[in-house]
Swiss-Prot record:
Main localization, broad class: secreted
Subcellular location as annotated: Secreted
GO terms (BP aspect): angiogenesis; artery smooth muscle contraction; axon extension; cell surface receptor signaling pathway; cell tip growth; cytokine-mediated signaling pathway; endothelial cell migration; energy homeostasis
Residues the record marks as site: Cleavage: 69-70
Name this polypeptide is given: Endothelin-2
Annotated organism of origin: Homo sapiens
UniProt note on tissues of expression: Expressed in lung, but not in placental stem villi vessels or cultured placental villi smooth muscle cells.
Residues of the signal peptide: 1-24
Keyword Secreted: yes
GO cellular component, one term: extracellular region
Annotated stretches, region: Endothelin-like: 96-111
Keywords: Cleavage on pair of basic residues, Disulfide bond, Secreted, Signal, Vasoactive, Vasoconstrictor
Pfam families listed in its UniProt record: Endothelin
Length: 178
């Protein structure tokens, strides 16, 4: 006859083995999708395209779909981008490379020249030239480009106004004597 402590230990051991095997099967089904992302070493982020330069903030915002933008007084900084940028050739004709060739918005965006490189708004026809030709109607692409031009001009104007306000103003000593 088997003693009671031995029976108790064998039942507890069998129960632990059964629970451990069951836990292992459930954990294996849950860990399989997660292990595929861990096998690559980094979290894959949704990207519409890949920017040629991380300094082109408009491109980074357009291409990376799941970043978080934090507004700071001086600049807008992206967080959650993952790995640091890799070196690329400087002679890239496009500002970014689309993930899907069937995305016309991405193709149009990547062919445009970034505002940071341009330095100023690209020259267009003056309002007088448009008035003389009589063509005031615009296609959707031209209208969108005009809106972007207006936005850029306003932001450049606001930056220049802030810089003008920061400069110390010289006052004449005559005004202080009164």
């Amino acid at each position: 006859m088997v003693s009671v402590p031995t029976t108790w230990c064998s039942v507890a051991l069998a129960l632990l083995v059964a629970l451990h095997e069951g836990k292992g099967q459930a954990a294996a089904t849950l860990e399989q999708p997660a292990s595929s992302s861990h096998a690559q070493g980094t979290h894959l982020r949704l990207r519409r395209c890949s920017c040629s330069s991380w300094l082109d903030k408009e491109c980074v915002y357009f291409c990376h779909l799941d970043i978080i933008w934090v507004n700071t007084p001086e600049q807008t900084a992206p967080y959650g981008l993952g790995n640091p940028p890799r070196r690329r050739r400087r002679s890239l004709p496009r500002r970014c490379q689309c993930s899907s060739a069937r995305d016309p918005a991405c193709a149009t965006f990547c062919l445009r020249r970034p505002w940071t490189e341009a330095g100023a708004v690209p020259s267009r026809k003056s309002p007088a030239d448009v008035f003389q030709t009589g063509k005031t109607g615009a296609t959707t692409g031209e209208l969108l480009q005009r809106l972007r031009d207006i936005s850029t001009v306003k932001s450049l104007f606001a930056k220049r106004q802030q810089e003008a306000m920061r400069e110390p103003r010289s006052t004449h000593s005559r005004w202080r004597k009164r």
